[in-house]
UniProtKB/Swiss-Prot annotation:
Listed transmembrane segments: 378-398, 575-595
Species whose genome carries this gene: Macaca fascicularis
Topological relation to the membrane, as annotated: Multi-pass membrane protein
Gene: ERMARD
Source lineage: Eukaryota, Metazoa, Chordata, Craniata, Vertebrata
Origin superkingdom: Eukaryota
One GO CC annotation: endoplasmic reticulum membrane
Record bears the keyword Cell membrane: no
Name of the protein described by the UniProt record: Endoplasmic reticulum membrane-associated RNA degradation protein
Length: 668
């Protein structure tokens, strides 16, 4: 797929020029003492005077600014290289304390001293993410909602109020605009090779960070405000994403060889992969993940541009989208296959996924606490991906290793763990397990007869009759190759767990779900959430009343309420199980909603929202504050009639989906 002339840069000519050439055009020497004092205090005027503006003074002249700032950056870089680490820490360490990660900066100093290009690029990535997080904290001294994008943050009036507009303009030149050096985006999106990032820009960004700390100190003293750091976030649903085993030394040796043989890796980017491996072996898991994420994007962008025959898009492509800008189908998902695309979407894009790249690049994760398990998953996936781009002979040799064969097998069987479909399945099974606990709730034997007598009323009996009819109806819509009871006149309660587990094991297409499907999933998930809340409230209320009964602290009214509650529970258990069954069947057939016209869709949405309304009312009525157990019976009867009426119209998704004639009898 990737046979062609070697790629020498992933930067456009103009971006290459501004980063690699423009800041070196002026050869004049700049006196370091005019930039920073012996005590490490930044002389901002020298720096801000280098920023150029357009003739109308309405905007920044980015090219002119980069050109003038070049000698300043050179002087700063030489200055840092002339210091010992001890001197650096004495002069500058206090001015990094305003960031939430001050210990990063001595590491960056070490990277600059090492003169190793990949380490300097990695340092610059970590510096920009740390700076963005710290600037967000400063923004919140005045503002209320911190902008998500760094460029919007740098353009905010709040930061200009703290640091001054001329200082913010300096930052815009380095990291705040695609018209400037744009160092953050160029590195975090994997465009710049190690040799294309001048180390002097890393040195300059470090000095600017120290200078911002000095300006902030003055501002805080003047305003009597206190800077508070937001807590780091913990990425969500990571436990669901652990599908690959720990990477072994055997797998690492395969990766080391594959890196030099796989067409997926651009030769100019190979040093990043080599450093990523070193970082993994030395337990620097966040560093490894940062490098892997950026280089996976680089490699995938190259495959994207090749498959879609748009080499110019190597510079800009949005690689995970379904369509290209011209409306044509993106060939990358077809080539990689759904499992690989699902993995990428889970880790990078899904709102309920860990969104590792986003959180790392915005400085929201504590790098020291970044988990080995997460990096393991990225590394294992990278191995499988690289092997897609080696020749058949070498692939056969690698596949002889059991550990490699296992990784490939697991990757090929991957399905989304962060898509709303998976989350709804997880929710249903958790709720079913919660409802199952009701059968174990204690109830005084001496009250059993009274509770049974309360159940014997026409409305409760009508509810049970409707539940039986609907269970029979729904059972006929089990998907192909799933079980059907021999005797549909009676559904034993012990079959519900097996039934729901089987349904939740049914594959549902998740990649590039249409908006209409996602809208339905939102409502179905809301129903599941409310069912779970009801289940939890019932358990707590029952345990409380039983404890009061045992301790003989139940008053007469509370005793009657306890009986009504128990009577209600015996109805709510099959009702909630039925609703879980219904929403899971609808989930399995959710793509059938695309076959509805606008009117039919609105009617369907109205129907599922009526079930949601019922579950929300149940939450209210079963709460400790309201305790309206009798009213739940009338609510339940009403919603069961609605469900049955709508089912009779054959407008549920189970009615629209194609019926399979293949059925398997379940042993009863």
């Amino acid at each position: 797929v990737l046979i062609g002339d070697p790629i020498t840069t992933c930067l456009s000519p103009s971006v290459y020029d501004i980063i690699c050439n423009l800041g070196f055009q002026l050869r004049e020497n700049c006196d370091i003492n005019s930039i920073v004092t012996q005590n490490g205090e930044v002389c901002w005027k020298t720096i801000t005077d280098c920023v150029s503006y357009t003739e109308s003074d309405q905007g920044l002249d980015y090219w002119g600014s980069v050109r003038l700032l070049g000698p300043v950056c050179e002087a700063v870089h030489s200055h840092f290289l002339s210091l010992t680490k001890g001197q650096f820490e004495i002069r500058y360490a206090p001015w990094f304390q305003w960031t939430s990660f001050p210990e990063l900066f001595p590491e960056i100093f070490d990277a600059l001293e090492s003169l190793q290009s990949p380490a300097i690029s990695l340092s610059l990535m970590k510096l920009t993410s740390c700076l963005e997080r710290a600037l967000g904290d400063v923004f919140l001294l005045i503002g209320k909602e911190c902008p998500f994008l760094l460029r919007d943050l740098l353009a905010s009036e709040e930061l200009a109020q703290v640091f001054g507009q001329s200082v913010m303009n300096v930052l815009k030149v380095f990291v705040g605009s695609p018209c400037g050096l744009n160092l953050r985006n160029v590195l975090w999106h994997g465009f710049a090779s190690p040799e294309e990032v001048p180390p002097k820009y890393c040195s300059m960004m470090m000095l600017l960070t120290a200078g911002l700390g000095q300006l902030l100190k003055s501002y805080l003293q003047k305003t009597k405000l206190t800077l508070a750091h937001r807590s780091f976030i913990t990425p969500t649903n990571l436990e669901d994403l652990i599908v690959f085993p720990d990477v072994t030394y055997e797998v690492l040796s395969v990766l080391e060889e594959a890196m030099t043989k796989s067409a997926f890796i651009l030769k100019i980017m190979l040093p990043y992969w080599e450093v990523a491996l070193v970082k993994f072996k030395s337990h620097r898991f966040a560093d490894c993940a940062i490098l892997l994420l950026t280089q996976l994007e680089t490699g995938l962008r190259n495959v994207f541009a090749t498959l879609n025959r748009c080499p110019q898009r190597l510079l800009t492509a949005e690689i995970l989208a379904k369509h290209l800008n011209d409306g044509k189908i993106n060939q990358l998902p077809l080539f990689l296959g759904e499992p690989a695309m699902e993995f990428l979407w889970d880790f990078l894009n899904h709102q309920e996924g860990p969104r590792i790249r986003d959180h790392l690049s915005h400085g929201e994760i504590n790098l020291h606490e970044f988990s080995k398990e997460t990096t393991n998953q990225l590394l294992a996936f990278s191995v499988v991906l690289l092997l897609r781009f080696v020749d058949e002979g070498l692939l056969s040799v690698f596949k002889e290793k059991a550990s490699v064969e296992l990784l490939i097998s697991l990757a090929e069987g991957y399905s989304s763990r962060c898509h709303p479909v998976f989350q709804l399945k997880k929710q249903v099974l958790s709720c079913e397990e919660s409802i199952r606990v009701w059968a174990l709730l204690p109830f005084p034997k001496e009250l059993t007869w009274e509770a049974v007598r309360l159940e014997d009323n026409s409305e409760t009996n009508a509810c049970h009759s409707l539940i039986t009819k609907m269970t029979d109806e729904l059972y006929h819509h089990m998907p192909e190759d799933h079980c059907v009871l021999k005797d549909l006149d009676h559904l034993p309660t012990e079959t519900w767990p097996q039934l729901l587990h089987e349904l939740c094991s049914t594959p549902v297409r998740t990649l590039f779900c249409p908006r209409i499907v996602l809208e339905v999933l939102v409502v179905l998930r809301s129903i599941g959430k409310q069912c779970h809340r009801v289940s939890g409230q019932v358990t707590i209320a029952s345990e409380l009343r039983h404890r009061q009964w045992v301790e003989r602290t139940l008053r007469s009214r509370q005793r009657q309420n306890y009986l009504r509650m128990w009577s209600s529970i015996r109805l709510l258990s099959p009702v909630l199980s039925l609703i879980l069954f219904l929403i899971t069947l609808e989930l399995v057939n959710v793509h059938a909603v695309c076959g509805k016209n606008a009117h039919e869709y609105q009617q369907y949405l109205k129907f599922v929202k009526s079930i949601l309304q019922y579950t929300e009312n149940l939450v209210a009525y079963t709460s400790y504050e309201k305790n309206k157990w009798n009213e739940t019976i009338n609510l339940t009867h009403t919603v069961l009639l609605k469900i049955w009426t709508f089912s009779e119209k054959k407008q549920m998704l189970i009615h629209l989906a194609k019926k399979s004639t293949s059925k398997v009898l379940m042993k009863t």
